[in-house]
Protein backbone atom coordinates (compact mmCIF):
# COMPACT_ATOMS: atom_id res chain seq x y z
CA UNK A 1 0.00 0.00 0.00
CA UNK A 2 1.01 3.58 -0.56
CA UNK A 3 0.15 6.73 1.39
CA UNK A 4 -3.56 7.43 1.15
CA UNK A 5 -4.64 3.86 0.40
CA UNK A 6 -6.76 1.88 2.81
CA UNK A 7 -8.05 -1.64 3.26
CA UNK A 8 -10.74 -3.04 5.48
CA UNK A 9 -12.84 -6.09 6.16
CA UNK A 10 -15.39 -6.84 8.88
CA UNK A 11 -12.67 -6.99 11.58
CA UNK A 12 -10.03 -4.42 10.76
CA UNK A 13 -9.40 -1.16 8.92
CA UNK A 14 -5.89 -0.13 7.82
CA UNK A 15 -4.95 3.27 6.39
CA UNK A 16 -1.49 3.91 4.95
CA UNK A 17 -0.14 7.28 6.03
CA UNK A 18 3.10 8.95 5.04
CA UNK A 19 6.72 8.63 6.02
CA UNK A 20 9.77 10.81 5.54
CA UNK A 21 11.88 7.66 5.23
CA UNK A 22 11.20 4.30 3.60
CA UNK A 23 7.72 2.84 3.39
CA UNK A 24 4.65 4.21 5.12
CA UNK A 25 3.17 4.60 8.56
CA UNK A 26 -0.15 2.99 9.49
CA UNK A 27 -3.40 3.73 11.25
CA UNK A 28 -5.07 0.48 12.28
CA UNK A 29 -8.57 0.29 13.72
CA UNK A 30 -9.43 -3.03 15.33
CA UNK A 31 -11.74 -4.10 18.17
CA UNK A 32 -12.73 -0.49 18.86
CA UNK A 33 -9.15 0.70 19.20
CA UNK A 34 -7.13 3.02 16.98
CA UNK A 35 -3.43 2.17 16.73
CA UNK A 36 -0.69 4.22 15.08
CA UNK A 37 2.42 2.40 13.83
CA UNK A 38 5.01 4.95 12.73
CA UNK A 39 7.14 2.56 10.69
CA UNK A 40 10.22 4.68 9.87
CA UNK A 41 8.46 8.04 10.28
CA UNK A 42 10.62 10.18 12.56
CA UNK A 43 12.59 13.40 12.85
CA UNK A 44 15.74 11.52 11.85
CA UNK A 45 18.16 14.45 11.64
CA UNK A 46 17.13 16.13 14.92
CA UNK A 47 20.68 15.83 16.28
CA UNK A 48 21.82 18.45 13.79
CA UNK A 49 19.22 21.03 14.94
CA UNK A 50 21.52 22.51 17.57
CA UNK A 51 21.96 26.09 18.77
CA UNK A 52 24.91 26.57 16.41
CA UNK A 53 23.09 25.24 13.33
CA UNK A 54 22.60 28.19 11.00
CA UNK A 55 20.18 26.55 8.58
CA UNK A 56 20.58 25.13 5.11
CA UNK A 57 22.45 22.14 3.82
CA UNK A 58 25.23 20.54 5.84
CA UNK A 59 27.59 17.64 5.22
CA UNK A 60 27.53 14.58 7.45
CA UNK A 61 30.05 11.74 7.12
CA UNK A 62 27.23 9.30 7.92
CA UNK A 63 24.47 10.72 5.69
CA UNK A 64 26.20 12.92 3.13
CA UNK A 65 24.50 16.18 2.23
CA UNK A 66 21.40 16.86 4.34
CA UNK A 67 19.16 19.77 5.27
CA UNK A 68 17.90 19.10 8.81
CA UNK A 69 15.34 21.93 8.76
CA UNK A 70 13.89 20.74 5.46
CA UNK A 71 13.67 17.18 6.80
CA UNK A 72 11.99 18.35 10.00
CA UNK A 73 9.51 20.36 7.93
CA UNK A 74 8.73 17.24 5.89
CA UNK A 75 8.31 15.22 9.08
CA UNK A 76 5.95 17.80 10.59
CA UNK A 77 4.06 17.90 7.28
CA UNK A 78 3.47 14.16 7.53
CA UNK A 79 2.12 14.66 11.06
CA UNK A 80 -0.22 17.33 9.71
CA UNK A 81 -1.49 14.89 7.06
CA UNK A 82 -2.04 12.18 9.69
CA UNK A 83 -3.96 14.66 11.84
CA UNK A 84 -6.43 15.13 8.96
CA UNK A 85 -7.36 11.46 9.48
CA UNK A 86 -7.14 11.15 13.27
CA UNK A 87 -6.07 13.27 16.21
CA UNK A 88 -6.04 10.57 18.88
CA UNK A 89 -4.72 7.04 19.22
CA UNK A 90 -5.24 4.40 21.87
CA UNK A 91 -1.79 2.94 21.16
CA UNK A 92 1.21 4.58 19.47
CA UNK A 93 4.25 2.60 18.31
CA UNK A 94 7.05 5.04 17.52
CA UNK A 95 10.83 4.91 16.88
CA UNK A 96 12.96 5.99 19.84
CA UNK A 97 16.29 5.14 18.27
CA UNK A 98 19.40 6.16 20.20
CA UNK A 99 21.50 5.58 17.08
CA UNK A 100 20.18 8.95 15.87
CA UNK A 101 22.36 10.65 18.50
CA UNK A 102 21.47 13.74 20.52
CA UNK A 103 17.85 14.71 20.01
CA UNK A 104 16.74 11.15 19.30
CA UNK A 105 13.50 11.60 21.25
CA UNK A 106 12.54 14.81 19.43
CA UNK A 107 10.36 13.13 16.80
CA UNK A 108 8.42 11.11 19.38
CA UNK A 109 7.95 14.18 21.58
CA UNK A 110 6.70 16.20 18.59
CA UNK A 111 4.22 13.44 17.78
CA UNK A 112 2.89 13.29 21.35
CA UNK A 113 2.54 17.08 21.45
CA UNK A 114 0.23 16.94 18.42
CA UNK A 115 -1.85 13.83 19.11
CA UNK A 116 -3.84 12.55 22.06
CA UNK A 117 -1.91 9.41 22.89
CA UNK A 118 -2.91 6.40 24.95
CA UNK A 119 -0.23 3.77 25.54
CA UNK A 120 3.15 4.76 24.08
CA UNK A 121 5.25 1.85 22.78
CA UNK A 122 8.86 2.62 21.80
CA UNK A 123 10.44 0.77 18.90
CA UNK A 124 13.70 0.63 16.87
CA UNK A 125 15.85 0.87 20.00
CA UNK A 126 17.42 -2.58 20.41
CA UNK A 127 20.73 -1.59 18.78
CA UNK A 128 21.08 1.37 21.16
CA UNK A 129 19.84 -0.57 24.20
CA UNK A 130 16.54 -0.85 26.02
CA UNK A 131 17.45 1.94 28.43
CA UNK A 132 17.76 4.37 25.53
CA UNK A 133 14.02 3.99 24.90
CA UNK A 134 13.21 4.53 28.57
CA UNK A 135 14.36 8.13 28.18
CA UNK A 136 10.86 8.86 26.84
CA UNK A 137 9.24 7.78 30.12
CA UNK A 138 9.70 11.10 31.90
CA UNK A 139 8.11 12.93 28.97
CA UNK A 140 5.13 10.57 28.68
CA UNK A 141 4.56 10.34 32.43
CA UNK A 142 4.53 14.15 32.72
CA UNK A 143 1.59 14.03 30.28
CA UNK A 144 -0.04 11.08 32.06
CA UNK A 145 0.54 8.81 29.06
CA UNK A 146 1.25 5.17 29.90
CA UNK A 147 4.65 3.99 28.65
CA UNK A 148 5.50 0.37 27.94
CA UNK A 149 8.93 -0.07 29.52
CA UNK A 150 10.15 -2.99 27.42
CA UNK A 151 13.00 -4.75 29.22
CA UNK A 152 13.83 -7.69 26.97
CA UNK A 153 13.33 -8.99 23.45
CA UNK A 154 10.18 -11.03 23.00
CA UNK A 155 8.35 -9.36 25.87
CA UNK A 156 4.60 -9.05 25.35
CA UNK A 157 1.72 -7.20 26.94
CA UNK A 158 -2.04 -7.74 27.07
CA UNK A 159 -3.94 -4.60 26.17
Residue ranges and their predicted role:
Residues 1-7, 104-159:
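Binuclear metal-ion centers of metallo-dependent hydrolases, dominated by the metallo-beta-lactamase
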Residues 1-87, 152-159:
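Core dinuclear metal-dependent hydrolase active-site scaffold
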Residues 16-19, 23-25, 92, 108, ...:
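Small-side-chain structural scaffolding
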